Regions:
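Basic- and aromatic-lined ligand-binding clefts that recognize polyanionic substrates
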Residues: 19-35, 131-183
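Extracytoplasmic ligand-binding site segments that recognize negatively charged/polar headgroups
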Residues: 91, 108-120, 155-175, 223
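Flexible loop/hinge segments that line or gate small-molecule binding clefts
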Residues: 52, 90-121, 125
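Structured C-terminal subdomain patch of bacterial secreted/periplasmic proteins
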Residues: 21-22, 114-124, 133, 144-149, ...
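A short, structured surface patch at a secondary-structure boundary
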Residues: 21-76, 80-86, 188
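His/Asp/Glu-enriched short active-site or ligand-binding loop at hydrolase and phosphoryl-transfer sites
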Residues: 47, 173-196, 216, 248
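Proline-aspartate-enriched helix->loop->beta-strand connector
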Residues: 62, 67-83, 101, 200-217
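Sec-dependent N-terminal signal peptides
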Residues: 3-14
Length: 276
């Protein structure tokens, strides 16, 4: 009986410590995955790219994932930091390790399979493997639907937060390029440049995309980034405008490569397929 009592005390002590842990998540994919696994109760701060679920936008922010400061992190007194290989600069990563903080660095996802791997890794680290398997099963089912409904290679362009007269398009090697291919499209600029590059209105008209995707960061900007093309006389000859195939997409949902990427991609395909 005495041994049982001691064991219960130890278990309760460990449970209390876990409940009181202060966790910082850096990287939108990591933050979203932690919360999707229902383990976000101890998260006390996030980075700027973390926007899903919406409630994390109310948490203190520790900066941009590639430009984190040691002081900003340490001021939050974290017990654990969960991040990806995109975190930097390297000297800050080393300083945090030297400070004795439990810093867990996951591989940054680059595709659908990587998203599943990240779920596995985070779930294992947080000791919730069963929840991880359940979440993966849900995404696998959604991915199966995507494979059945995939688009038939329409010409697509993705613009990051476009403004009037400023069209920043995704080239090859970008997550937007992967998104376009994932839903069954072809990026009109994939053979022209890598990363993001500003293109002219003449380029857009010449390539005549079937579908235009406009990435927005804040929901209130969704209509604004769409109207730049929709209400412009200069683009009325473009197939995407004529056929009402112009969509605002949340950058957090489609470019952070968290669990919501799959469902958002499926919903986008369904919207495109329902337009007559």
């Amino acid at each position: 009986m005495k041994h049982l009592f001691v064991s219960i005390l130890i278990f309760c002590s460990l449970l209390a410590n876990n409940l009181n842990e202060r966790v910082i998540t850096i990287g939108g994919c990591v933050t979203e995955t932690v919360f999707a696994l229902e383990m976000g109760q101890n998260v006390v701060a996030v980075d700027i790219s973390s926007s899903i679920p919406n409630k994390v936008t109310q948490l203190p922010q520790v900066g941009y994932i590639r430009g984190i400061s040691t002081e900003g992190i340490l001021s939050m007194n974290p017990d654990k930091i969960l991040t990806t290989t995109e975190m930097g600069p390297p000297k800050v990563v080393q300083q945090l390790k030297d400070a004795g903080i439990n810093l867990k660095i996951f591989n940054a996802p680059k595709n659908y399979d990587d998203i599943l791997s990240l779920i596995d890794d985070v779930a294992t680290f947080l000791d919730v493997s069963k929840k991880g398997e359940q979440l993966k099963s849900e995404l696998i089912e959604l991915n199966n639907q995507i494979n059945e409904l995939k688009l038939d290679k329409p010409k697509i362009v993705f613009f990051m937060s476009p403004a009037l007269g400023s069209y920043n398009a995704a080239g090859s090697g970008t997550r937007a390029d992967y998104l376009i291919n994932y839903i069954g499209g072809e990026n009109i600029f994939t053979n022209d440049f890598k990363r993001y590059t500003k293109v002219s209105k003449e380029d857009i008209i010449k390539y005549n995309p079937d579908i235009i995707l406009t990435g927005y960061v804040r929901e209130l900007n969704k209509k604004e980034v769409v109207d730049i093309f929709k209400n412009s006389d200069e683009f009325q000859s473009v197939a995407a405008i004529k056929n009402n195939q112009l969509y605002g997409v949340s950058v957090g949902e489609v470019l952070n490569f968290g669990p919501s990427f799959v469902n958002t991609s499926l919903n986008l395909i369904k919207k495109i397929n329902t337009v007559e």
